[in-house]
Amino acid sequence: MEFNPNFTLSLELTKILLEIERHKEAIDVMPINFGMVASLRETARLLSTHYSTQIEGNALQVSEVERLSQGGKGGFPGKERDEREVQNYFQALGYIETLFDNAKPITEKQIKEIHSLVLTGSKRGTPYREGQNVIRDSKSGSIVYMPPEAKDVPRLMKGLTSWLNYQVKEQVLPAPIVAGLAHYQFATVHPYYDGNGRTARLLTTLLLHRMGYGLKGIYSLEEYYAKNLMAYYESLNIGESHNYYMG
């Protein structure tokens, strides 16, 4: 299934894109020495890991995440699962960093490897789900979104991957638009039972770097998402229907 997103570049959105471009250019020419860049990147990795896992309910504090990032063994009673999630996310971040400057197309295999690292810490690759999943309201338990059937997931993911590689190569659309649409479509398809959000955010980071919007690796988009969580969720829930096939 081809992915042909339907969207409008409004005047307001155009102004935002111009503002983003202005800040990007300022960062690109910012005179920062190598040591400072390395330190800022390490901080960005720490914050990206903390906030992306926090969005999904991880209870570790920044100081605890920092301890794990420095090779600490954890030892936080009752938070063993949280520790594994953080360690796995660090590994997934490290993996996508090896892909930033890769001129070859992004593949479904790589996306599956990213997801596998997120969930298990292994790069063996996770198959797409084989059954139906649903997204429920965390408080009421009611179904708020019904993703596509499992039989359609491979074709939808193939279409998404083909589209994003075309955009990376041809630069038809602004990078922030491509990243946002890719994030939205991945979350909409929900190709896995768990780990979709973390994988989507990592894919977004990879796309931005591939399109020249890495911002020297010194910023954490995940921190922005977490600190604007309601707006983040609302942006992923702007469709007219609770069912994928109904729009």
Regions found by a protein language model. Give the residues of each.
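FIC/Doc superfamily catalytic core
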Residues: 1-247
